[in-house]
Amino acid sequence: MLILVTGGAASGKSEHAERLVCEKAQSRLYLATMQPFGKSAEARIARHRALRAGKGFATVERTLDLANLRLSRQYDGILLEDLGNLLANELFAPEGAGAGSAFDSIVAGVDNLQKYCETLVIVSNEIFADGVTYTPETMQYIRILGELHQKLTGKADAVYESVCGILLPVKEGKQP
């Protein structure tokens, strides 16, 4: 089963995604993709660690190249946190896939993760509604993230958007 949970900043998407994994999975893996650049990132990482404390998650930190990730065991559920950070790493890190391959690399990574679990829950960001003009690199990031959302929504069994702490169904069940 593949579930995509999207939402804006501080919308509750991570908490909802954790709850979904906990409801569906006895053995749980948290796959962290954020690089700890600066105090703000470190604070977010600490907050997420505190959120999942005591919930039985094993943790793997992997910032890119999920297609080549090899796990030592199967899990009932994997929580991938989050797609936006993973894309930024693949696009902008020197060892990342780069603009020409980031989309395919991430889709291959999702396919790989699904081999290791019954339920994969992916957290991502809704960043498409502010109407501000950005640099070409940022516009490329936004475009690829949107394309990833479309691809993963097509593959997903369920898609939810977290709005003001409320989890709203966008898609439930396979659709053509």
Segments (PLM) and residue ranges:
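Conserved P-loop
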Residues: 2-71
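Structural motif
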Residues: 4, 79, 121-123
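Short secondary-structure boundary segments
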Residues: 7-8, 82, 126, 163
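Short, glycine/serine-rich, charged loops/turns that create anion-binding
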Residues: 10, 35, 84, 127-128
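Residue-level signal for inorganic ion chemistry
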Residues: 17, 48, 79, 125, ...
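Residues at the starts of beta-strands that form the adenosine-phosphate
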Residues: 26-29, 76, 119, 158
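Helix-adjacent hinge/juxtasegments
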Residues: 55-102
